[in-house]
Amino acid sequence: MLWVLGGKKIAKCLKETVNPKEIEDKELIKFLINFCDMCNDFVIDDEKIGIKIDKCKYCPKQIGEAEIPGSACPIPSILASCMRELTKKDYKINLWDGNKVIIKENGYCWFRIK
């Protein structure tokens, strides 16, 4: 829930700067990742978003060395809530296998927002 509130606050700050009606989803995601300085290497394709694990600046496991099970990645929640607030569209995190926010593959953490 904390990450959702963070995304909403970011969106409120950006409302005067960004017109999301003029930006496609991919470009909005790219803008938000860069604006929030989330990572230095990422991939956005039609179905998923990948954050390079060793370039992520938000990872509680890599940066903070937190020893917690599963994923605690705040990025999908921040992006989805920020996009919802900016566009007034119902963006949600699309889970992998019905229960995973993140999957790790080829050095990236992958997630989906629809």
UniProtKB/Swiss-Prot annotation:
Protein name per Swiss-Prot or TrEMBL: Uncharacterized protein MJ1342
Organism: Methanocaldococcus jannaschii (strain ATCC 43067 / DSM 2661 / JAL-1 / JCM 10045 / NBRC 100440) (Methanococcus jannaschii)
